[in-house]
Amino acid sequence: MEILSLILYTVIFSFLLQFILRSFFRKRYPLPLPPGPKPWPIIGNLVHLGPKPHQSTAAMAQTYGPLMYLKMGFVDVVVAASASVAAQFLKTHDANFSSRPPNSGAEHMAYNYQDLVFAPYGPRWRMLRKICSVHLFSTKALDDFRHVRQDEVKTLTRALASAGQKPVKLGQLLNVCTTNALARVMLGKRVFADGSGDVDPQAAEFKSMVVEMMVVAGVFNIGDFIPQLNWLDIQGVAAKMKKLHARFDAFLTDILEEHKGKIFGEMKDLLSTLISLKNDDADNDGGKLTDTEIKALLLNLFVAGTDTSSSTVEWAIAELIRNPKILAQAQQEIDKVVGRDRLVGELDLAQLTYLEAIVKETFRLHPSTPLSLPRIASESCEINGYFIPKGSTLLLNVWAIARDPNAWADPLEFRPERFLPGGEKPKVDVRGNDFEVIPFGAGRRICAGMNLGIRMVQLMIATLIHAFNWDLVSGQLPEMLNMEEAYGLTLQRADPLVVHPRPRLEAQAYIG
């Protein structure tokens, strides 16, 4: 007990000493820092975040403006909450904000920064980005695997059509669909047997692992902001991360070892390509791939490429159930282009203008990543007359930017018409060029899988609109549907969407 007491007193004394020294020798900057709430001693503004940081920082922006400074423990943090401020960071000063700050999630779950998402900006990151751009996300690669996405969406449609009177947890089946579509491209096979969440018990387990990773990764870990407390793991976050990483690593190691030594035909999957690149110089500067980097890349693709798309589609269907006139108009458009004797195909999407507006409006109101992944200032800079110190962490409140009343009329309403000709934002896109809505980020660290994500989300939403009418479980009124958010790295629904799908096409459309 005496040793523990000595350790505790030493920690408290070191905190007080550091706080006094920091207060006494406060840095002098050539310009003022951005405004923000007054920090508490030691913990700073961590106390102001609450359980949903995207909402709390959006509320702060109403008081302090769209560029805020927060002191999170001993870490300088700046928050951008408007399109113009976001453009300053990710367009004008993009090169200065292209790396990630140290964080426990990258250390414990992303193979110690050896993945694409958290790797420092440099040769290794460029190598991983190039591999994804060429072999998975290029236009040719997306076109080559179009049939895979359509097959898995058709499997999803059959599963929903066969539900009968049984209520369906839509999010789980959507996750199975997106995971199998990505797995067939990456691994050459499905992860979940026949694509039915009811049949394969792995589906629920995998979904829970992905959601748990997103929730844990979205926690503001005190140890990241007060390094002296890191070893205590006060919130138990590091322990959860390590256990979750062990489960994912076992899953990915089995896949990798099973794949080695296989002989592939002309159409290789991504993993076989990655394995072959281990023996080549994948990039002039980047060097060769390692098994750890391959597993880290697979982890990125499985987590970021499945849960984000499925949660976006779940939000879209919830909004359409609450807005039956919008649903009916979308069905009318698709019926006119596709008919009722077959399912929507990817090549039909270019003709579906109203559907595209629905997808954009869903990305606006329900961005899968409400707070951007953090970036770090490599050097000090000036933004809008304020000083941004070197080493500051940058957070973009994507959720607040897309709900800014100065940029959007009736920002809380689901109104796809705003993106149509004659609407308020007919030319605004979601691909990182228009900062009013940036669900995939922008600049050098924009989401590598953006084009795949857009294609998959459009196809799934179009198919679900076209193939089914939607009823809530008995007693629920559409206007009373709970639209509360559950915060994590991705924006989940607080209550999973439980529905009765009612087929509306000719029977032959669901066969085959």
Swiss-Prot record:
Q: Which UniProt keywords apply?
A: Endoplasmic reticulum, Flavonoid biosynthesis, Heme, Iron, Membrane, Metal-binding, Monooxygenase, NADP, Oxidoreductase, Transmembrane, Transmembrane helix
**Enzyme class per UniProt:** oxidoreductase
As cofactor, the record names: heme
GO biological process terms, semicolon-separated: flavonoid biosynthetic process
Principal localization? Answer: endoplasmic reticulum
Reaction catalysed by this chain? a 3'-unsubstituted flavone + reduced [NADPH--hemoprotein reductase] + O2 = a 3'-hydroxyflavone + oxidized [NADPH--hemoprotein reductase] + H2O + H(+)
Q: How does it sit in the membrane?
A: Single-pass type III membrane protein
Tissue specificity note: High expression in petals and ovaries and to a lower extent in sepals, pedicels, anthers and stems. Not detected in leaves, style or roots.
Where, in this chain's numbering, is heme bound? Answer: C447
Further comment found in the protein's record: May act as a membrane anchor for localization of other, soluble, flavonoid enzymes to the endoplasmic reticulum.
Sorted alphabetically, the Gene Ontology cellular component annotations on this record are:
endoplasmic reticulum membrane
Q: Does the keyword Glycoprotein apply?
A: no
The subcellular location is: Endoplasmic reticulum membrane
Which PANTHER family does the protein's record reference? CYTOCHROME P450 98A9, FLAVONOID 3'-MONOOXYGENASE
The GO molecular function terms of this record are:
flavonoid 3'-monooxygenase activity; heme binding; iron ion binding
Family statement drawn from the similarity comment of this UniProt entry: Belongs to the cytochrome P450 family.
Pathway where this protein functions: Secondary metabolite biosynthesis; flavonoid biosynthesis
Family matches, as SUPFAM superfamilies: Cytochrome P450
Stretches in topological domain Cytoplasmic: 22-512
Q: Say what the protein does.
A: Catalyzes the 3'-hydroxylation of the flavonoid B-ring to the 3',4'-hydroxylated state. Convert naringenin to eriodictyol and dihydrokaempferol to dihydroquercetin.
Q: Which EC number(s) does UniProt give?
A: 1.14.14.82
- Please report the name of this protein according to its UniProt entry: Flavonoid 3'-monooxygenase
Ranges that cross the membrane? 1-21
Reply yes or no: does the keyword Iron apply.
Answer: yes
